Amino acid sequence: MISSQDVGKRVRLSRILPDGRSVIFAFDHGIEHGPGEIPEERLDPRLLIREVVEAGVDAIMTTPGIARLTWDIWANRVAMIIKVSGKTSIRPQDDQFLQSAISSVDEVVALGGDGVAATVYWGSQFEDKMLERWTRIRLRAEKLGLPALQLAYPRGPHIKNRYAVDIVAYGARAAMETGADLIKTYYTGSTESFRRVVSAAGGVPVLMSGGARTPSPQEFLHKVYSVMEAGGGGVVVGRNIFQAGDIRAMVKAIRAIVHEGFDPEKASKLLG
């Protein structure tokens, strides 16, 4: 018989990955990059969260403050993953490869969250500190039946190209071996190379980090398609959704690729 914790984790994972795949809206950009990246008309988190929920995302990954402010909008409609680590871009340059605690697994449970997320900068001079914190987070989440999503980002003074397939695959493998239930990481530029990242993760779902807004929505849809063709578990997207001209159309197009197997050309027709 499986444990109560295993049941809880499976139930929550089924909300995050309804068919084994997921379109997750990432919205931790205010603390990470400042409000300047968010269009002024979308600065109110209640307005933006309502729009992405109605657009049809499967889950939201955000900070505890935004989860608390918008609970009545997302509750019972989408899965909620709360990020418990963070940093600002205005902290000293020497500390840019370190994330600090901004919440706890217990607060995630208190807020009604379905999952917990935290970053590890693999290769950073602070890797030891971040890995120690990740382990505490994961073990507490395991005890309470919450899936743990690791933002597995290779970054550090000795990493020349953080998007190189060998580096990204290393980070994905390290995330799997340190107990991640879901892995968010960089796109490596091609289906073939990202397939190596997926393989390195040993069966743990690998979701592409959306990154900066692409020059065109069509270009981003090609990335999404490439990830899914490589066996990825979906995408975690922020700027390519909240900076889009039409949020609902963009989410609809991404969903069509992730859940319905549309190719980029067919999905692009949904953009209007």
From Swiss-Prot:
GO CC, alphabetical: cytoplasm
Subcellular localization: Cytoplasm
Active site, UniProt feature: 184
Keyword terms, alphabetized: Cytoplasm, Glycolysis, Lyase, Schiff base
EC number(s) on file: 4.1.2.13
Catalytic activity: beta-D-fructose 1,6-bisphosphate = D-glyceraldehyde 3-phosphate + dihydroxyacetone phosphate
SMART domains from the UniProt entry: DeoC
Top class in the EC scheme: lyase
Keyword Lyase: yes
Coiled coil: none
Highest taxon above the source species: Archaea
GO molecular function (one): fructose-bisphosphate aldolase activity
InterPro entries, per database record: Aldolase_TIM, DeoC/FbaB/LacD_aldolase, DeoC/FbaB_aldolase, FBA_class_1, FbaB-like
Pfam families: DeoC
Family note: Belongs to the DeoC/FbaB aldolase family.
PANTHER family per UniProt: 3-HYDROXY-5-PHOSPHONOOXYPENTANE-2,4-DIONE THIOLASE, FRUCTOSE-BISPHOSPHATE ALDOLASE CLASS 1
Protein known as: Probable fructose-bisphosphate aldolase class 1
UniProt organism field: Aeropyrum pernix (strain ATCC 700893 / DSM 11879 / JCM 9820 / NBRC 100138 / K1)
Gene: fba
